Regions:
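Amphipathic, Lys/Arg-enriched alpha-helical "gate/interface" segment within cytosolic domains
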Residues: 1-123
């Protein structure tokens, strides 16, 4: 499942992946929130937390993630991904060259640092 996280500025979309993340989670929760935010802001930041209760993500959910990312490719300002899942960290580093915004992966023990970074002013 995907849960929307509170306590972030309006230009930061923040979610946590818990348990098994599915395509339905993206279609019913994440994508509508992203579209609503882009209706109000030209550029957004994205914070995604995949902690100890994250069990995995199905292939269809990954496809939805890729589609929403590419649909708004030039409008993403910054990404923070918090995870200790090595394959996710590696996948992000492989695809980071495609993304125009800054991308950082943080370990779960550094979640506070990730939250500070995602809201910090751009240089």
């Amino acid at each position: 499942m995907i849960a929307k996280l509170q306590g972030f500025p309006e230009n930061v979309i923040a979610f946590a992946g818990r348990g098994q993340v599915t395509k339905d989670d993206y279609v019913s929760t994440l994508i509508p929130a992203v579209e609503r935010a882009f209706a109000s802001y030209d550029r957004l930041r994205f914070y995604y937390e995949l902690g100890g209760d994250f069990a995995g993500i199905d292939v269809d959910a990954m496809a939805e993630d890729f589609k929403i990312g590419m649909q708004h490719l030039t409008r993403w300002e910054r990404f923070a991904v918090v995870t200790d899942v090595k394959w996710i960290a590696h996948a992000i580093s492989l695809f980071s060259f495609v993304m125009p915004g800054a991308i950082k992966v943080f370990s779960t023990k550094d979640a506070d640092q990730a939250r500070s970074w995602i809201v910090s002013p751009s240089l």
